[in-house]
A protein has these predicted regions:
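N-terminal secretory signal peptides that target proteins for export/translocation
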Residues: 1-2
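Sec/Tat signal peptide C-region and signal peptidase I cleavage site
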Residues: 15-22
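Predominantly the C-terminal beta-signal and adjacent terminal strand-loop region
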Residues: 143-176
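Gram-negative (and chloroplast) outer-membrane scaffold detector with strong preference
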Residues: 43-150
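Short, surface-exposed coil-to-beta transition loops
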Residues: 35-38, 133
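Short N-terminal segments immediately surrounding and downstream of signal-peptide cleavage
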Residues: 22-36
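Bacterial N-terminal signal peptides
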Residues: 6-14
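A short local loop/turn or secondary-structure capping micro-motif enriched for an aromatic residue
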Residues: 33, 59-61, 157-158
């Protein structure tokens, strides 16, 4: 029985073909630099369209003494339209995203775009978010099996959270 199953599986895998122009496995160097575990998978669905699925996970407390943390997980599906050919050159992107976070006692994040990031130094937030956005990017082909891409985008997110006073000891003071 096992011999037949092995032969069947080997024949299926030898008949199936895939090339670098049909799919890609990727990582985000920015997240890698912040010790966030991340992985992406992109697959071609038409001549100039791909779907990208990426995820990110950071389970680490940065400083256990002060309870400084930026813990999170999120998933981001994205559709991309390529102007020239898939996986190379200019592209437009539309994405959704959602996840969960536990962030507090972080005092190095600047205020930008109407956020309340400076509050992270005095409070801890635990919650969920969901959102959508658009982007523009470019992918440079470095070789037969290697690309590097850059993307800039804008989007919005809706978040609901519990707010805790004192980033370390944490008595709950409200919800949103």
């Amino acid at each position: 029985m096992y011999k037949r199953l092995t032969i069947l599986l080997l024949s299926v895998f030898t008949l199936a073909s895939a090339s670098a122009q049909d799919w890609a496995i990727k990582t985000n160097l920015g997240y890698d630099a912040t010790a966030s575990i991340n992985l992406g998978f992109e697959v071609a669905v038409a001549d100039k369209w791909t779907l990208d699925f990426s995820g990110n996970y950071n389970p680490f407390t940065m400083n256990k003494d002060t309870n400084m943390k930026w813990k999170h997980w999120f998933a981001q599906p994205e559709a991309r339209y390529w102007f020239c050919h898939r996986f190379g050159g200019h592209f437009l992107a539309m994405h959704l995203w959602g996840g969960q976070y536990n962030v507090g006692n972080v005092d190095f994040v600047p205020k930008m775009l109407g956020t309340n990031f400076p509050n992270l130094a005095d409070y801890r937030y635990e919650g969920f978010f969901t959102g959508a956005g658009i982007g523009y990017g470019y992918a440079w082909m470095l070789g037969n099996h290697w690309n590097i891409e850059a993307q800039i985008g804008i989007g919005g997110a809706y978040t609901w959270y519990d707010k805790y006073y004192c980033p370390k000891c944490g008595e709950k003071i409200g919800s949103n």
